């Protein structure tokens, strides 16, 4: 709340989170919504990973907390993640305030235009049709997550927490700071990511841009075989130095 100024217009809320994979509880969302309502701040809710929740965690949309919150919320969503339709480039925004919805529509029609009719039909069918395949994919993601987290925490020098949702793991490399790996002195995640790419031939995302310089992001949105190979290369990379 201390960060709010007279210039603050909106809070961007990513839930489930990229890059951490954490999920906000209903109580946390209520606390955030209360602050936003008190200061007349809109909530831009990025809920693209809403179907990917694990360990029985239930997703709560901030817009579902009441009519007043709904009017102050702009939901950003799509089918790229939960429905594995990345190449279709389909997304949408929804707002309980019709005035904002009209402005968004006008802006979109003049600046970008619409996505293809075929893409729109595919998105509608994905969201309206049977959801069995979506649940099957979620279960597979959960299995991959469990393997990645367990295996990573067995490797000396690195660790991670188990994420609640999405398909990312934040690997803690704090113990590697100061070491020389792949011919580079590791000062932060940028150094590690580059060294691991050059020597281990594995691409991870530095979290320096997320204000987490001692972490890199892994994804488990790939096959279990690829995950195993990546972790094998991590072990080899750390042992060889």
Residue ranges of model-derived segments:
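PLP-dependent class I/II
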Residues: 1-241
């Amino acid at each position: 709340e201390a960060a709010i100024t007279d210039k603050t217009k909106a809070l961007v809320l990513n839930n489930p989170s990229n890059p951490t994979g954490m999920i906000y509880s209903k109580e946390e969302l209520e606390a955030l919504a209360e602050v936003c309502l008190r200061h007349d701040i809109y909530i831009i809710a990025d809920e693209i990973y809403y179907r990917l929740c694990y360990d029985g965690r239930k997703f709560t949309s901030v817009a579902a907390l009441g009519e007043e919150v709904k009017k102050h919320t702009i939901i950003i969503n799509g089918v790229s993640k939960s429905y594995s339709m990345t190449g279709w480039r389909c997304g949408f925004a929804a707002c309980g305030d019709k005035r904002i919805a009209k402005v968004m529509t006008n802006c979109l029609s003049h600046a970008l235009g619409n996505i293809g009719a075929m893409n729109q039909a595919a998105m509608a069918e994905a969201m309206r049709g049977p959801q069995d395949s979506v649940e099957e994919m979620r279960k597979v993601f959960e299995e991959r997550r469990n393997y990645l987290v367990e295996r990573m925490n067995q490797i000396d020098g690195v660790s991670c927490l188990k994420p609640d949702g999405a398909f990312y793991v934040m690997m803690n490399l704090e113990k590697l700071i100061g070491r020389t790996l792949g011919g580079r002195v590791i000062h932060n995640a940028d150094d590690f990511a580059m060294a691991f790419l050059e020597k281990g031939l594995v691409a991870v995302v530095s979290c320096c841009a997320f204000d987490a310089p001692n972490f890199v992001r892994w994804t488990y949105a790939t096959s279990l075989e690829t995950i195993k190979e990546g972790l094998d290369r991590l072990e080899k990379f750390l042992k060889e130095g």
